[in-house]
Amino acid sequence: MVDWRILKKVDAHIHILPDAVHEANPDSDDVWAYADLHKYYQMMDVLNIDRAVIMPLNDPWLMSVEYTISAVHKNLYEMKQRYPGKFYAFADIDTRNSPAVSVEAICQAIDEYSLDGIKLHPNNTGIALDAEYNHAIFLFAQEHNVPVVIHSYPNSTDDPGAAMRIVTMLERYPKLTVIISHMGAYQWEELLPTRAYMDISAILPDYVRTYGINKTNELMRKLGADRLIFASDYPDNRFLQPEEIYGSYFDILNQMDFTQTEAEMIAYGNIKKILSI
């Protein structure tokens, strides 16, 4: 049996707020108080998390005190620089800007700030994944081999991040590298025929609550170790407190029947391949 507590891992989906945002909200007592770069760094050795990928939220009010996309990207860059080689970060989207301006901001994020991909959160932007606004972003990412992470935790078939919207998008951009966050939640079966990677952030404890361990193991087997990516969504979770997230993940994953080689693919191999690290 693989022991996920001691297995080296890259957490491919965490949330960290800039120091300036924490300083501007000193009385915050919600989960975002845990989204602290320095506190997270101190946790990494204990959890055997070798590296982590910071995901923005398509919400400039959370990721800067200037509320601009350029400020968000600068903050993400500074987080990467604070602990070199330990953190990666994906570019944000601010749909107050035109698609052309968004692509320009992504170019700057990659070229000047060395960010590592693009994050789209259709529920936060209010723009459906397959809407025309996103065309220029996907086209740029496909042409420049930039990975895209898509939030997909839909509660209906017409949700902005619904699985069938992802299927449509993948058909339109056949060479795009895509990671589906939260595995498309309870629409995961519609994503089985696709080539998209799946990060297991947030959703894994939900699956166990709904399906039980054995069926959760079966659905992960259907998706395949070559597509699954270890991720937590720390510090956010619908049912767990921040302090409970990693322990819950390790307990669940320890009950899966992945081989050592498969576990290593999920824990760090697939994301390192995507990020070329």
Task: List each language-model region with its residue ranges.
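Conserved, mostly hydrophobic/aromatic
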Residues: H13, M44, L76, A109, ...
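Catalytic pocket-lining loop regions of alpha/beta-barrel enzymes
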Residues: D116-G117, A131-I229
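Active-site gating/metal-coordination segments in enzymes
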Residues: E66-V149, N155-S156, L204-D206
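Short, acidic/polar
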Residues: Y34-M44, N97-I110, K215
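Active-site environment of divalent metal-dependent phosphoester hydrolases
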Residues: L17-A20, D59-L62, T95-S98, T125, ...
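A cross-domain feature marking catalytic cores of carbohydrate-active enzymes
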Residues: I14-I16, P56-L57, A91-T95, K119-P122, ...
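Divalent metal-dependent hydrolysis catalytic cores, especially in the metallo-beta-lactamase
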Residues: D27, V31-S64, K86-D94, D116-G117, ...
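Mid-to-C-terminal alpha-helical segments outside catalytic/metal-binding sites
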Residues: M1-L17, V21-R51, G224-R227, Q241-I277
